[in-house]
Curated annotation (Swiss-Prot):
InterPro entries: Mo_CF_biosynth-C_arc (IPR023047), MoaC_sf (IPR036522), Mopterin_CF_biosynth-C_dom (IPR002820). It comes from Thermoplasma volcanium (strain ATCC 51530 / DSM 4299 / JCM 9571 / NBRC 15438 / GSS1). The active site is at D119. This is Probable cyclic pyranopterin monophosphate synthase. It comes from the Archaea. Substrate binds at Y68, C69, H70, M104, E105. Catalyzes the conversion of (8S)-3',8-cyclo-7,8-dihydroguanosine 5'-triphosphate to cyclic pyranopterin monophosphate (cPMP).
Length: 150
């Protein structure tokens, strides 16, 4: 957060609180691409496991990507995947005990995992002109945010 003068918010007087945030988002893909992911037949490797690692890395590096985000201690990152007929849904939950929220880390985790999925399967998604008519990322949002006094 920033104050009205454009400075990073001073959180030094805030209490340390247990916090959790969960975000979700989807990437829509061709049915054939979903089948390739399910059968671990993507050239670049295991899409789910690599995307789990990328999502975790994005969560941990949020403060480096968003200038006014605080560098907070991340105590947990859980990245889950659900494959539908024409989509992969990524859900990321992040936890901390700190003075500010952890929802940006959860959102960043989802975005990183989704971007990685796109990168890994783009050769399967391109049409004859090199475009991606069916591929899209949608619905990235926070579905739950909690905090409780320790």
């Amino acid at each position: 957060m920033i104050d009205f003068d454009g400075n990073m918010i001073n959180i030094s007087r805030k209490d340390v609180v247990a916090r959790k945030a969960t975000a979700v988002g989807r990437i829509y893909l061709r049915k054939e691409t979903i089948t390739a992911i399910k059968n671990n037949q993507v050239k670049k490797g295991n899409v789910i496991e690599i995307s789990r690692a990328v999502g975790t890395m994005y969560a941990k590096n949020t403060f480096l990507q968003i200038p006014y985000c605080h560098n907070i201690p991340i105590e947990g990152v859980d990245v889950d995947f659900s494959l539908g007929e024409n989509y992969v849904e990524v859900t990321c939950s992040t936890t901390t005990s700190y003075k500010t929220g952890i929802e940006m880390e959860a959102i960043n985790c989802v975005n990183g995992a989704l971007l990685n999925i796109w990168d890994m399967v783009k050769y399967l998604e391109k049409d004859e002109t090199g475009n991606y008519p069916e591929t899209r990322i949608e619905g990235v949002h926070v579905i739950k945010k909690t905090k409780s006094q320790e």
